Amino acid sequence: MPCTLSDCLLAGMKRIAAAIDLLLPRTCIVCGTRLLSSERHICLLCAGEMPLTRFWKQSHNLMSDRFNDIIQKNLINGKSAPPMSCHEMPEAADACPGSCREPYAYAAALFTYHAEAPFRFIPYNIKYKGDIRAGEYFGRMLGARLMREEHWKDAEIIIPVPLHWTRKFRRGYNQAEAIASGLASAMGIPVRND
């Protein structure tokens, strides 16, 4: 039975991808082993051993609490002032019961970074080797996990960490924007780079 045009094109693309993979094999970012055709950027063994933070399961975690302390310090008190209590800031007392905090911002990381662990090659390749596709891939991986948790479903926007313009000019990209793009794709919400 003859194949349809789309089936023939898909089969042809798979053959071309297999030939390219034979000539220029794709390898796991973490361990360097050759990837199977179904694997992207990381092999199944390394993906199974990835030291996941599971921060996405908790609305309050070490990362988000530190992030919100920075928000409070910079937005409410100024960069060098110590945190104020509600009675010291009467205009904020009605806005935040029990404390003078900005609305809570969630934060999560996919995996724990250790300088000596082989997983250090993931951010290294994204940041210094220009592996933007890996950034998007791991962003989608985190985004899929975030969307399983109720407290992330009200997220409205993703804001990547800005990169100083001289570094962005030298590198040609901001790795945080690549990760944010993957997050946005998985979560169905926009990214703001401005």
Where are these regions (language model features)?
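Glycine-rich phosphate/pyrophosphate-handling loop used in enzymes and phosphotransfer proteins
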Residues: 1-194
